[in-house]
Amino acid sequence: MIAALHARGALPFRWVTGDEHFGNTPMLLDQIAAAKLSYFMEIPHNVRFWPERPLTAVPAATGKKGAPFTRVRLAPGASVAIRVDALAVALPRGAWQVAQIQDGSKGPLVAEVAFVRAVAVRDGLPGPDVWIVCRRALDAPQELKAYVCNATADTPRETLVWLLGLRWPIEQAIKEGKEELGLDQYEVRGWRGWHHHTAMTLLAQHFLMRLSSRLGGLPRR
């Protein structure tokens, strides 16, 4: 769906964000990257990465019998991929910086963030180079959130911080769609009816958001 929407060009976009369920789906991430798009996904703490790209090699034949090895494997002595939470714990204190993530309903949301270039794991082998973005609350540094992003190495840190704050407005938009436009008030038995209801509701919400932006903000109920 993402690739088809992008190819159609009807709704220009560059970034795809999601929660840790999507962030822990390598096939989805690779398909997004193959479509020349960038992803920024939350990931579980047990997802593993290499801080540096490990050595790989095709094993040498061990005897005269049998077919030679053809598949690349980790070279002997190659480093082991580590969990993202272990990677975050190992960061020096100077790697963390205070940043304003977004303007929330209760004021600015400020957190400590750190940015690390790492190598993703794909079928036990090194995959793409990615950003690991770590975030922790100022008053609860043990509560870690981690994100993976395939943006280029020269991506400004400000862009990665901006991406950290995108989920709140998306969640707020879904909440408003439910409360004000009946996004979740459907009584259908099949996919087509649900799809039509959802599409028309989101279209109406898009119209209202454009109108609100044009008029400088509409009063809320």
Language-model regions: role of each:
Residues 157, 170, 196-200, 204:
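Short runs of predominantly hydrophobic/aromatic residues within well-ordered alpha helices
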Residues 205-221:
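Conserved nucleotidyltransferase catalytic core and NTase-mimicking acidic/glycine-rich helix/loop elements
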